Amino acid sequence: MKLIVAGSTGFVATEVIRQALSNPSITSIKALARRPTAVPQDAGPGADLSKLKSVVCDDFEKYPESVKQELAGADACIWLIAITPSQLSKMPFPEARKICLDYTVTGIETMTPLASTPFRFLYTSGANSERDATKKPWVLGDFCVMRGQCESAVLDYAAKSQGKVQPCIAKPGLIDAPGKTGPFMSIVQTIGRTVIGLPKVQRSEIAATLLDQAVNGIEKETLLNEDLVRIGGNALAGSGKTGE
């Protein structure tokens, strides 16, 4: 199968690509980002590096024809372009909204006509994202509602696609990995777990889940953190690997 990984230079995307390189069901990986995507470290002896193609797109609001040609015929897209809560302070909220919502809508609208049928579109959101604006969380409320709007946009587009698009919304809590948690991040994660009540998932688990759903089919449209841990753990166990 041909897989698009959008936002391919990011923290989770790097692990998605690393695992995908060793997945025999995936024959082509288009790594879509603003800058070139490097081969992940520790790809492993079973990795087929020839499957990976870096696709640079300078403007996610308007895809040039050269980029569209690279994406054509894809069977699935794992969408990992977003602004995290820690990045919010570095930009105006309208800019964060554009990156999270507008880029996603333009992406699915651009890819779908070019893709195979069915086209599995996996959008990575967050555990506290809220589709119902009347239930706005008390922490980062506007951000959580905006991310919920992104989820709804993907689901609404898929519902109107006459079966062309099979959507999946992944809602992870805190994403952890070996070596990531220094003193500052330990404090942040403690606050996230105790104050906000965020669950935790390993980076290897969410990556394995996204790949499993892209290759084998969508179990359900919304995957909560507990689903990511369960599916990812089973997928890693089946491949003989362990979670990070």
Predicted regions and their residues:
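NAD(P)H-binding glycine-rich loop region in Rossmannoid oxidoreductase-like domains
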Residues: 3, 31, 46-106, 110-113
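Residues at the starts of beta-strands that form the adenosine-phosphate
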Residues: 2, 25-28, 118-120, 166
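SDR active-site strand-loop-helix element
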Residues: 6, 32, 80-81, 121-127, ...
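Oxidoreductase cofactor-interface core, primarily capturing Rossmann-like NAD(P)-dependent enzymes
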Residues: 8-11, 16, 39-41, 129-244
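Acidic-histidine catalytic/liganding microenvironments
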Residues: 23-24, 49, 157
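N-terminal Rossmann NAD(P)H-binding glycine-rich loop of SDR-like oxidoreductase domains
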Residues: 1-26
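N-terminal Rossmann-fold cofactor-binding loop
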Residues: 30-36
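Conserved Rossmann-fold NAD(P)-dependent oxidoreductase catalytic core, especially the SDR/UDP-sugar
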Residues: 90-98, 102-145, 168
